[in-house]
Amino acid sequence: MNIKPANRVNSVQEYYFSVKLKEIAQMNSRGENVINLGIGSPDMPPAPEVITALSENAALPSSHGYQPYVGIVELREAFASWYRRWYGVELDPSNEILPLIGSKEGVMHISLAFLNEGDGVLIPNPGYPTYSSVAKLAGAQIYTYSLDENHGWWPDFQGIEEAYAKGEIDLDRTKLMWCNYPNMPTGANGSLELFEELVAFGRKYDIVICHDNPYSFILNEKPLSILQVDGAKDICIELNSLSKSSNMPGWRIGMV
């Protein structure tokens, strides 16, 4: 038999964190006592009220059928209320929120929705490995932009435009720009000033700004959303998740 996978599979390798977790497990088995600074997995359980609510609803016969394709109304309304409470952002649960099986699913959906083969995507370096692996599956042209400590680990928009002027980056064919603040892996925080710059950059070059926002409660007494910026909804998509904020990574609950 000669069964071959699709060519696109050749462009990706085993997930970076999967490889590293195996290495860590091997080192720990040798007694090296490695501290894992990789995946941001909370080591505390969800609130007792959340577990109680899950248990009660799991007993209801109505909880086990197919859901609507856009998620149940109550969940979308709860997400809208959550954004209003914590971010001061108004979202229409009927057409501005889509529940996800964790926000990683959203990285794939967004990439396949916007990227044709050969289209450009701006990805931070260092950055979340999934951005690159999904872009490769989509056949996109990856343009990395460096996050430098001397620049506060923020995008250097002037540097990106200089690379464009030199022909090193084709912003005319670039469809998406990935960013996430608070940033993984640098730990740098964001600000409304940064988000305003991102929105302005996206508007200038017709690039969809994709803000991955699972860590907003980690460094901020008042969590930030890029959607707080005027006009952000016209050019921005934000991913969010209950994994870090509510200690629920195994529940796979996210939103876009």
Report each predicted region and the residues it spans.
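Helix C-cap/helix->beta junction micro-motif
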Residues: 30, 138, 204-205
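A short helix-loop-beta submotif of the ANL/AMP-binding
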Residues: 137-143
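Short acidic capping loops at alpha-helix termini that bridge into adjacent secondary structure
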Residues: 90-97, 117-120, 173, 233-236
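Conserved PLP-anchoring active-site segment centered on the Schiff-base-forming lysine
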Residues: 113-135
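N-terminal small-domain helix-loop-helix segment of the aminotransferase-like
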Residues: 2-6, 10-102, 109
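Active-site phosphate-binding strand-loop segment of PLP-dependent enzymes
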Residues: 147-221
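Active-site PLP attachment segment
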Residues: 229-256
